[in-house]
From Swiss-Prot:
Organism (species): Bacillus cereus (strain ATCC 14579 / DSM 31 / CCUG 7414 / JCM 2152 / NBRC 15305 / NCIMB 9373 / NCTC 2599 / NRRL B-3711)
Superkingdom of the organism of origin: Bacteria
Assigned protein family: Belongs to the sirtuin family. Class U subfamily.
Protein name per its UniProtKB record: NAD-dependent protein deacetylase
Function: NAD-dependent protein deacetylase which modulates the activities of several enzymes which are inactive in their acetylated form.
Molecular function in Gene Ontology: histone deacetylase activity, NAD-dependent; NAD+ binding; zinc ion binding
UniProt EC number: 2.3.1.286
Amino acid sequence: MIFVQQFEEVRSILEKAKKITVLTGAGASTESGIPDFRSANGLYADANVEMYLSRGYYNRSPKEFWKHYKEIFQINTFHQYKPNRGHRFLAELEEQGKDITILTQNIDGLHQLGGSKHVIDLHGTLQTAHCPKCKSGYDLQYMIDHEVPRCEKCNFILNPDVVLYGDTLPQYQNAIKRLYETDVLIVMGTSLKVQPVASFPQIAKREVGATTILVNEELTGQEYNFDFVFQNKIGEFVEGLSSMK
């Protein structure tokens, strides 16, 4: 009964909210079949991964960098992954006229493929790369088709649009600005272990006074920063909300 009441309350809050911000992590994409790279069995378990994905390694050995980059993120099979119910739910809220912005730690681009227009890619995206000289952009298929992708105009080895270790977060200030404008923060599918993103719920709750909602299978240790906690898969949460119609 309490569970049903929580869903009813959250549905009512979302209907009344003027500005909704959603923070998503790996759990938003695992239901599409994408591995959680930071899990115990994920590719981040390799001790060398942080080096391979670092700005310094790209600068020193760009050809070797691209070899490891493609292996780590399984670039050649990435087209098989499709947006799931959670991605579509957020896009549907936007289609209903809601002012909703997604702050995602994911680099898969599935929020955009699912139809969301206002997405801030905190860690960049796998879907594109660019020339470090002329800034021309290239898509995922171009990266797949070329062992070491180079700019067709300049012949420079492309720079991936993923934020590498050693880079700053270029979208951080945009994310913070949005956070301070929001009525509701929904955190979905993230363990909240990586800073500075781990501080977002506290900012929203303590400084902004927003309503905060957590949807995650595992406890995060930050439950005290949330008004509502759903220990569920995102798809289950969406189905629960949908059943309140």
